[in-house]
Design a protein with these regions (language model features):
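Non-cysteine beta-strand/loop elements that form the S-adenosyl-L-methionine
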Residues: 5-10, 88-89, 151
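Substrate-recognition element of Asp-dependent hydrolases with the DxDx(T/V) motif
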Residues: 36-72, 81-95, 141
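Gly/Ser/Thr-rich helix-start
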Residues: 12, 32, 55, 59, ...
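Short, solvent-exposed loop/turn segments at secondary-structure boundaries
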Residues: 24-25, 58-63, 101
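Asp-based, Mg2+/Mn2+-dependent phosphohydrolase catalytic module
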Residues: 3, 63, 70-84, 93-130, ...
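Active-site neighborhood of HAD-like aspartate-dependent phosphohydrolases
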Residues: 1-47
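Acidic active-site catalytic centers that drive phospho-/nucleotidyl reactions
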Residues: 8-10, 14, 51, 133, ...
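Residues that scaffold the ATP/ADP-binding catalytic core of kinase and kinase-like folds
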Residues: 16, 58, 184
Length: 193
């Protein structure tokens, strides 16, 4: 069985840019390569799970998504932090064109992308985590049956502030960024960076 870190992309790994699809707009968040390398060194597989409604809306193509992921991995590999697999949902139930305007099972918070990952990895859910900056990421991870971390990058800090007001924390851990998420997960599982 393999322990997996499932990762949202935009706002978690890279600076949030509406409908990011051009590599010149890709900016990795501080500490991301170091955190990913640390997870790899701990034996985790790294799997990106990302909704890409820009495909459904006709803003860019699936080839654009794959090319951006290839480029992102190129940048990360230079730092010893390569992603093991990327899964994306190109659909949207309301705002889409042609074959992409559907109610699917892959769009977060559904678990279809996690299930796709199970075709490539022998996922040990008890030792795996979902990390993201939105409640939809947290809900997806919970629906799949893994523990979750909300990061304060992207939309995460605002989400966490709202949840504090409500006194409701649907995530297992909160961390300011991905490197802190690594440290928090290690504390939960007995180590520290």
């Amino acid at each position: 069985m393999e322990k997996v870190i499932f990762l949202d992309r935009d706002g978690t790994l890279n600076v949030e840019v509406n409908y990011l699809h051009r590599k010149e707009d890709l900016v990795l968040l501080p500490g991301v390569p170091e955190a990913l390398k640390a997870f790899k060194d701990q034996g985790y597989k790294l799997v990106v799970i990302t909704n890409q409604a820009g495909v459904a809306r006709g803003y860019y193509t699936e080839d654009d998504v794959r090319e951006l992921h290839r480029y992102m991995n190129e940048l990360l590999a230079e730092r010893g932090a390569e992603i093991d697999a990327f899964y994306y949902c190109p659909h949207h139930p309301e705002h889409g064109i042609g074959k992409y305007k559907i109610q699917c099972r892959c769009r977060k918070p559904e678990t279809g992308m996690f299930e796709m990952a199970e075709q490539d990895f022998d996922v040990d859910k008890a030792s795996s985590w979902m990390i993201g900056d939105k409640l939809i990421d947290i809900e997806a991870g919970r629906n799949y049956g893994v523990r979750t971390v909300l990061v304060g990058t992207g939309y995460g800090a605002g989400v966490h502030d709202e949840q504090k007001k409500k006194g409701d924390f649907p995530y297992d851990l909160y961390a300011d960024d991905l490197l802190e998420a690594y440290n928090e997960i290690n504390r939960e599982t007995a180590g520290n960076l």
